[in-house]
Structures are given as C-alpha cells and as structure tokens.
Amino acid sequence: MKQIYLCGNAADFANYCNAFAALGAAVVTDSPERCDMLLLPGGADVHPRFYGQEITGARGIDESRDLAELAIARRFIAESRPILGICRGQQLLNVALGGTLHQHIEGHSPVDGRDRVHMVRTDDAFFTALYGARFSVNSCHHQSVDLLGEGLRPILWADDGCIEAVRHETLPIFAVQFHPERMCFAHARSDTVDGAALLAAVLEEL
C-alpha cells in the first residue's frame, strides 16, 4: 500500500483521505520518512511575503501552515521525491520553486457555497489519455499561478488562461488547481469528469 504524507491533521482533510483510501493508498501525518509521496492539499492563501509581495488580495492567511508546508515541500524537492499539489497545493508548490501568484482573480471562486464548474483545455498526453483535450472540472479558488516556479511547465488551462495544472520538467512533481477529491466516489458529479481517474494515474506515475 502506498503511503502519502500530509503535513497537518488528517481529520481536517477527510475528503483527500477517503479518496486515496478508496484507491488503496493511505494518507499519513506522523512521519514523511517512509512515505511514497507528499500531498499538498487545498486551504487558505499563501502569504504574499513568501513570494516577495505585499498583501493586495490574499486573505485567510495562516503563516504557520505556510512555513511548515514550504519546508516539507522544499525537502521533498531537494530529495527528488514525488509531490502532488491540489488547489492551494499547486500555488504553494509554485512559490516553493520561486514562482509568484495572482493574489485575486474573478470567476473561479464558489457561488452560493458551491464549487463552480468550468471547461479546461490541454494538449498534454497525460490528460488527453484520461479525459480528452477539453473537459469540465470544479473550481474553488480566487488565486492562481502567475510567474512559474523553476522547472514547472503548465499543462492545463481554463478558457480565461488560468493555469489549471503544472508538471515539473525533470522531477516527479505534479499539481492541479481543481479538486479531484471532490469529483469522485461519494462526491462524484455528473457535470465534471471523474477525479478518481486522475488520482489513480498520479499514484501510478509519480
């Protein structure tokens, strides 16, 4: 069974834990030493000071979480170990690699407490094999990747140009802006693709 390290309290990230458990993997929080992959999950905004900016649109900041996740992300990067970032996790990973963020964008945050759904496009073989060149995903964020971190390349975009997924050119690092764990199993939706296919493919590839 593959073990996935999460820096935090597993009870706060039940959707992730349940989705990976359904795929035969375990999310653990005690030690990253023997884990097969690091998971950087969704959550509040990364403090702009970590990418050299003042606060202009960031909110809900938790600097202690930022520091802990940046430290473990940079450790896994230095050791060339697999990382999966989801939503905030994609943004934090970009910052860990020296990139910056758009502190506020319109049209991607929830409406009446529910995730938006929008189309995304790709020419990347990983995604086209799973879902085709255009498909629908959920959306629940108000920040996004701006200047790319070192070694990252975009592989999926929303129609407005927002970067929806990145992959590292040489390291086993992959991240998405949407929430696949909220598009599968008990949270499967008829208006998006099945997020389980993506999570299973990441477990296999990374």
Regions found by a protein language model. Name each.
Residues 1-88, 95-96, 102, 106-126, ...:
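N-terminal beta1-alpha1 cap of cysteine-dependent amidohydrolase-like domains
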Residues 139:
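Short, basic/aromatic recognition patches
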Residues 174-178:
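Active-site-proximal beta-strand elements of phosphoester/diester hydrolases
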